[in-house]
């Protein structure tokens, strides 16, 4: 990975920061300065991207359909293939830790919890969202997972619907862009182009699309906001998730690009 996120703390000296950037470039990395927050720039943005993907699967899409749509868009790997590669038990441990830290907030189980409870941690166990043959990393759609997902939907009273490839891409990427706008507004990232560098060199975003923030400008920030507002209206449960970041709304209204 070429990306190097350099975290700027409240007491980080300017010369230390400058030296870190120089060293990063010297060893062939693409350094990007980040402020302090949970997940920094890249992983913090990845979370709502994954939530949007999980919303799609819960509503009727399959993991392989979501992966295919995003890979056809140009992503190096879809979110469910990435999850199997990284290990589903990592996210499971984080979710359990956060639930323990906030006992007053009721924990809402997700489909990935059911997979982990069944010992499906991803490639390391030969099965996760997909199943894998010994010595082969090629994902294979598993009917067992399809049944787990179907049972999870039925328990929640969800009638599955169809999604187009375009809508899958829009929902996942607009969630990514919205979090990027929050990161800019909070000063975690200094520039929109810094966010693009993070995703181009660390998260498999297609180079010819210029990064998520650049892509949003190409689509039109007004169009991004209008789509997000529609998603919020379509599901009361997801309305808070699709609340437009103030900075994104401001630039969509003014027509000025995010900088």
Task: Label each residue range with its predicted role.
Residues 1-259:
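N-terminal glycine-rich phosphate-binding loop for ADP-containing cofactors
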């Amino acid at each position: 990975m070429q990306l190097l996120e350099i975290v700027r703390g409240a007491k980080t000296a300017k010369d230390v920061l400058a030296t870190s950037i120089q060293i990063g470039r010297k060893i062939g990395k693409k350094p990007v300065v980040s402020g302090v927050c949970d997940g920094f720039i890249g992983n913090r943005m990845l979370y709502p991207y994954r939530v949007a993907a999980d919303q799609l699967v819960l509503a009727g899409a399959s993991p392989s359909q979501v992966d295919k749509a995003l890979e056809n868009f140009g992503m190096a790997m879809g979110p469910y293939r990435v999850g199997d590669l990284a290990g589903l038990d990592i996210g499971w441990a984080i979710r359990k830790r956060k639930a323990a830290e906030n006992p007053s907030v009721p924990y809402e189980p997700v489909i990935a919890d059911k997979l982990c409870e069944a010992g499906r941690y991803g490639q390391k166990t030969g099965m996760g969202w997909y199943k894998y043959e010994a010595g082969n990393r090629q994902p294979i759609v598993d009917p067992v997972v399809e049944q787990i997902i179907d049972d999870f939907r039925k328990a929640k009273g969800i009638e599955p619907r169809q999604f187009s490839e375009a809508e899958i891409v829009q929902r996942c990427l607009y969630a990514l862009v919205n979090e990027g706008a929050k990161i800019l507004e909070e000063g975690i990232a200094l520039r929109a182009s810094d966010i693009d560098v993070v995703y181009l060199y660390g998260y498999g975003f297609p180079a010819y699309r210029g990064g998520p923030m650049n892509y949003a400008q190409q689509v039109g920030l007004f169009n991004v906001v209008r789509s997000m507002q529609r998603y919020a209206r379509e599901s009361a449960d997801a309305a808070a998730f699709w609340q437009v970041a103030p900075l994104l709304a401001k630039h969509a209204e003014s027509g000025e690009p995010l900088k």
